[in-house]
Amino acid sequence: MATPAAVNPPEMASDIPGSVALPVAPMAATGQVRMAGAMPARGGKRRSGMDFDDEDGEGPSKFSRENHSEIERRRRNKMTQYITELSDMVPTCSALARKPDKLTILRMAVSHMKSMRGTGNKSTDGAYKPSFLTEQELKHLILEAADGFLFVVAAETGRVIYVSDSVTPVLNQPQSEWFGSTLYEQVHPDDVEKLREQLCTSENSMTGRILDLKTGTVKKEGQQSSMRMCMGSRRSFICRMRCGNAPLDHLPLNRITTMRKRFRNGLGPVKEGEAQYAVVHCTGYIKAWPPAGMTIPEEDADVGQGSKYCLVAIGRLQVTSSPVCMDMSGMSVPTEFLSRHNSDGIITFVDPRCISVIGYQPQDLLGKDILEFCHPEDQSHLRESFQQVVKLKGQVLSVMYRFRTKNREWLLIRTSSFTFQNPYSDEIEYVICTNTNVKQLQQQQAELEVHQRDGLSSYDLSQVPVPNLPAGVHEAGKSVEKADAIFSQERDPRFAEMFAGISASEKKMMSSASASGSQQIYSQGSPFPAGHSGKAFSSSVVHVPGVNDIQSSSSTGQNISQISRQLNQGQVAWTGSRPPFPGQPSKTQSSAFGIGSSHPYPADPSSYSPLSSPAASSPSGNAYPSLANRTPGFAESGQSGGQFQGRPSEVWSQWQSQHHGQQSGEQHSHQQPGQTEVFQDMLPMPGDPTQGTGNYNIEDFADLGMFPPFSE
C-alpha cells in the first residue's frame, strides 16, 4: 500500500523550494526525493550561517589575515637588514665584487667568528711550527725576522698588557719601562689623538669622506665605518715612539744594529733636554680580551680594567724619507747637500748633510731666504739665476757664489737647480737645488788622483810574471838560457849577449868568424832584426840569415834598394833606447843595410851569416848565390870575389841570367809595406820552378827547422 508521499511524488517534490521534478521510477523516485529534500535543507542552513558570518565575523577574520602578512613582511625586512649589516661587518663579504646571497653571508660570518676566537683551525693548529723549535724560540725568530717588537694594549684605556723583550734593541728602552704604563705615554704628544682613534672600537666622529678605490669616487663613510671599527678589523698606522738614551754596549755592532741606529736618527739630531723619538710602523688587529678559553688572574684583572678588546700589533722602525749622509755619498765627509726652495728662494727643506758642509742645522735654515747667506756681491747674480731657472721650467742651471757658513767664513758653493712642475696644473711647485762645496770636492778629487797614481807607480813592469814555459825554451822553439836577453831594454851596444845562449846545434851553422861577440851585426833601426831573426818574427815565413840579408848583383841591388825605401816607412825596429853605434853613416846609400867601404864592418861577408860556411850550409847547385861578384851597386867595391870559397862564379852568372828578367818584371807586383812580403820575394829565389826540383837537397837543410825531414 502506497504511502501518501509516494502517491503524489511530483507534487511533493514541487512544493520543496529548489527541487526539480524528474520522471523517475516510483522506488527510485522515493529515494531521490528524500535525498533531494535533505540537501536543500543543509544548503539553507549553510547559507544562513554564511550570512551570519558576513554580518558579524567577516571583519575580524580579514583583519587577522592582513595582520599576519604584515608581520611576516616586517620580519623579512628586519632579517634582510641584519644580514646586510652582517655582510658589511665581515671583511670577506665586503671585499666581494657583488653582494652575496644570505646563505653565503652567514657562512662567511661563522668562519670569521671562528677565526677570531681561534677555533677555526684546531685540526692544523701548530702544524706550521717545526718540531725542533720551542714556542719561545719561534717567537724570537719571528720578531728578529720582522726586526720589531710585539705589544698588546687595551683598546679602551691604552694600558700595556704585554710587550716583547725585543723592544730593547729597537727603541733602546728596557721592557720594564713599558709595563705599567700606557701607550699614550710612549708616543709623541702630537700623535696621541691619532692613536686614540686607532684604538677606538665604537662609532665616533671619524666617519668622514673616503676614496672608493674601485670607482675612484669620493663618498661618505656609511656602514663601512662600522666594519673598520669592529672587532677583528686590521689596524695599520705610523706614529713616533719615545726612544731610550741608555747606551747598550752588550748588543753586537752588526748591520741590523747600524740600520736601527740610522733609522732612529732619521728625524734629525735631538736638542739637549728633549726626548728622542723614532718613527714606528704598527700593524695588527683588534682582538677580544681575554681570549676564548683563557682566564686571567685576579691580580692582572685590573690591568685590562674590564676591557673587552685589545690591540695586538708589531712595531717596526720605519725607513724615514730624510736622506742620510752615508746613504747618498760614498765619501767619509759629504761635499754636497740638497735643498728645496719656493719660487722666491725661501728654503722649505734641507737634508742633514748640510751640517757637515756648511755647519748649520736643518732647522736653522728652514723658512729663510737663501740670499741671507749669500755674499753681498753675489746676491744679484744668485737672484737672477733663480729667476732664470723658473723660466727654464725643468732645465738645470748652475751658479757659483760665496756662502756664509756658521763660523762666519765665506765658502765657495756651486748650486745646480731645477724646478718641479705639477703635472696637472703645469705650475711650478718648488725649486730643487744641489749645493756642492767646490774646494772640498776638488781636494777629494786630487786625493783620489794621487791614490791612483800611487797605485800605478807601485806596479813594477819588470816583475810581471812570465807564463811558465819549459826551462830555456824560447817562443820560437829555440833553446835559450835567458828569456829576456833579446828583449831587454838595457842591452850592450854591440849586442854581445845575443849569441851567448845559442845551442850547439846552431853553432854548427855559424862560421868561426861570427864567434866574436864584439862585432857589430847591423845598423840601428834596421828593418831586419839582428842575430836570430827567425825567432824574432813569429810568422809563417822563416828568415834565413845570409840569404835574405845580403845580395850582390846589380839587379837585385836595385830591387833591394826599392824594397828598403818602402820598408823604411813602416819598418820594425827596436823600441828601446840604445846608444848610437860608432861610425854609423847616414842612410843615403841605395842598399838596405848601408854597407860601404868606409863602414867598420869586416870585409869577410861570412861573418854576417851563420849559413856562409860551404861545408855546412851551401846546397849543391845554384840554389844560393855565391855573392862572389859584387858590383858597386851594393856599395862594397873594395872587397874581392875570392872570399866566398866553394861557390864558383859561374853559378852566380847562371842564376843571374835566369832570374834577372823575372825579377825586373815582378819587382813592383808583390811589394807590400810589411816585412813578410820581402821574405816572400826572396825565398822563392832558391826554389824557382825554372831551376827544377833537383836543385833542392833535403840533406843540405838538415839543421834548419823549416824543412823537417821525412822518409819517402
UniProtKB/Swiss-Prot annotation:
Superkingdom to which the source organism belongs: Eukaryota
Outcome of substituting R340A: Compromises SIM1:ARNT2 heterodimer stability. Does not compromise NPAS4:ARNT2 heterodimer stability
PROSITE patterns listed in its UniProt record: BHLH, PAS
Composition-biased stretches (Low complexity): 597-626, 653-675
CDD domains assigned to the protein according to its UniProt record, in alphabetical order: bHLH-PAS_ARNT, PAS
Ranges of Basic and acidic residues composition bias in the record: 63-73
Protein's UniProt keywords contain Transport: no
One term under GO cellular component: nucleus
Chief location of this protein within or outside the cell: nucleus
InterPro entries membership: bHLH_dom, Circadian_TF, HLH_DNA-bd_sf, Nuc_translocat, PAC, PAS, PAS-like_dom_sf, PAS_fold
Record annotation: effect of changing N422A: Compromises SIM1:ARNT2 heterodimer stability. Does not compromise NPAS4:ARNT2 heterodimer stability
Subcellular location: Nucleus
Domain spans labelled bHLH: 63-116
All residue ranges annotated as the PAC domain in the record: 398-441
Tissue expression summary: Restricted to adult brain and kidney.
GO biological process, one term: negative regulation of apoptotic process
GO terms for MF: aryl hydrocarbon receptor binding; DNA-binding transcription activator activity, RNA polymerase II-specific; DNA-binding transcription factor activity; protein heterodimerization activity; protein-containing complex binding; RNA polymerase II cis-regulatory region sequence-specific DNA binding
Region ranges (Disordered): 36-73, 573-712
Function statement: Transcription factor that plays a role in the development of the hypothalamo-pituitary axis, postnatal brain growth, and visual and renal function. Specifically recognizes the xenobiotic response element (XRE).
NCBIfam families: sensory_box (TIGR00229)
PANTHER family linked: CIRCADIAN PROTEIN CLOCK/ARNT/BMAL/PAS (PTHR23042)
Subunit structure: Efficient DNA binding requires dimerization with another bHLH protein. Heterodimer with NPAS4 or SIM1. Heterodimer with the aryl hydrocarbon receptor (AHR) or the SIM1 protein. Interacts with TACC3.
Name of the molecule in the record: Aryl hydrocarbon receptor nuclear translocator 2
Protein species of origin: Mus musculus (Mouse)
Origin organism lineage: Eukaryota, Metazoa, Chordata, Craniata, Vertebrata
